Amino acid sequence: DAAHCTYGEVYEINCARYGREADLPISLFKQALDDAVTGKVTGPEAVLDLRLKAFSDIAQNHVTENIFSHYMYKTLPTGSHLWTFKRQLTHQHALSCFVSALLRLGGRTPQKIMCAKNTGRVFMLDFHPAFDSKGITEFVEPVPFRLTRNLYTFFTPFGVRGDFVVAMAAAAQAMSAPGANIETQMMLFYRDQLMVWPWRRMSGAGPQALLGPTPADVRVMARANVDEVM
């Protein structure tokens, strides 16, 4: 669909426009960490400094913070369209970030976040949690949600501190309001996700993984995940 694109596709279009290799930043990052892999650089602080230096170099020279902004400036026909799109996208992304943080959903890479260029709506691909062998959500993200430099630049500081924060706070207030019944909704969500989770592929799930958890086990796991969220 020409009206939809992922953030990853926006980056690839920018690379094609300026004749850059899309995978070059990954290669450069790996090369920068060769000293850590070979043991020339040891210690957590030294490795962290090496990673930070590599990230700063790539962010400054290869993946700048205005890629998404330039794409939307070239795509939308007028300033009115741009203003409406920017505000709608800010609200939509704030809600997506809130749900991601609430349900402990990680892996929000640019290829898994899609937006509609004609409406500003945000769609998440592969929007489901990952579970360990005990059925508890695995969340190893270093940040609670995805707000990259490119999105921050496009939203502007005023948009982030205004529409983005307000939309996220309004969603949190609605979830915690009396009568929201959020626990029941989350129980249903985790129950459905646990029932379709590929238990056979879990290395530490034990011999019962071939059969999968029983309905009683699923209820216990879902309850544990809801308690973790709440």
Indicate where each model-derived feature is located:
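ATP-dependent kinase catalytic cores of phosphoinositide-metabolizing enzymes
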Residues: 1-95, 110, 115-230
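Structured secondary-structure scaffolds
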Residues: 98-99
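Catalytic-loop of the protein kinase fold
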Residues: 103-110
